[in-house]
């Protein structure tokens, strides 16, 4: 894999070849599993009611576009916050996430990131926030390939 001018392989332009699929039942539409608004980490308040007694998904922005089954495989039954560790101002994220973890009874945390190196920063941020919170909450990281498959 070549590097772009900025040195980040995640910024490399690429075409993803797909064979055209035909849906068995084109009258059935996927149902959204989103249970809250807003979803951007910058916008969600730490005291939002959907974080209480919840499983939380913290997903990199690109994950929902890369993983076709995002709603059914990752989002279903979870509160969500999305962020981009490369493009967002992430300075407030560690403290904000720590506040979410401290102020709520969180059952589990799933971090969903892309396989590109710059996306790993989101996993690091969440782990630092969890440590800062003083809580012990089960944490899982899901790594999604740029071709749309789960890597782990």
What residues fall within each predicted segment?
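Iron-sulfur-associated redox domains of electron-transfer enzymes in respiratory
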Residues: 1-152
